[in-house]
Swiss-Prot record:
Organism: Streptococcus agalactiae serotype V (strain ATCC BAA-611 / 2603 V/R)
Top EC class, one word: hydrolase
Gene name for this UniProt entry: pth
InterPro entries in the cross-refs: Pept_tRNA_hydro, Pept_tRNA_hydro_CS, Pept_tRNA_hydro_sf
Biological role stated in the UniProt entry: Hydrolyzes ribosome-free peptidyl-tRNAs (with 1 or more amino acids incorporated), which drop off the ribosome during protein synthesis, or as a result of ribosome stalling.
Annotated EC: 3.1.1.29
A Pfam short name: Pept_tRNA_hydro
Protein name: Peptidyl-tRNA hydrolase
Amino acid sequence: MVKMIVGLGNPGSKYNDTKHNIGFMAVDRIVKDLDVNFTEDKNFKAEIGSDFINGEKIYFIKPTTFMNNSGIAVKALLTYYNISIKDMIIIYDDLDMEVGKIRFRQKGSAGGHNGIKSIIAHLGTQEFDRIKVGIGRPNGRMTVINHVLGKFDKNDEIMILNTLDKVDNAVNYYLQTNDFQKTMQKYNGLK
């Protein structure tokens, strides 16, 4: 069986470590202890890495389409590698959750997230596994755009590193058990 773990974000160094790039950060954390090197594939508009875990080929994906067009890369890669939607997990930021909280879902609307809107539009379904990482709402007069494209406050940095470790543990648990439902029950709502 082949699986695909996708972290959403925006390409380019100016977006490194921004809240909107928590998906990229999570994928980078997951592969940190594996033998994975990313290569940019311009045909698929993504950085792609892979490894074998428990005898299964796992693709780690960071779309380079910019957030709002993430569905283009996701659909192309699922089709090319003949991966079922049920064997894919999308990791992304969520404004409506407190900073550092993680939530697992097997289906649902985009909730205003343009990357998820794009994936739903290109796949034609809302039924795919996902891990949402809370980035909180902007304070005061800050716009949503400035908030999601901003970096985490110093106070939140250690919490985010711990959260990324939890996402890593959860994805590894999923890859061991091959059971997203069980993973949800074990890790949902952690902070």
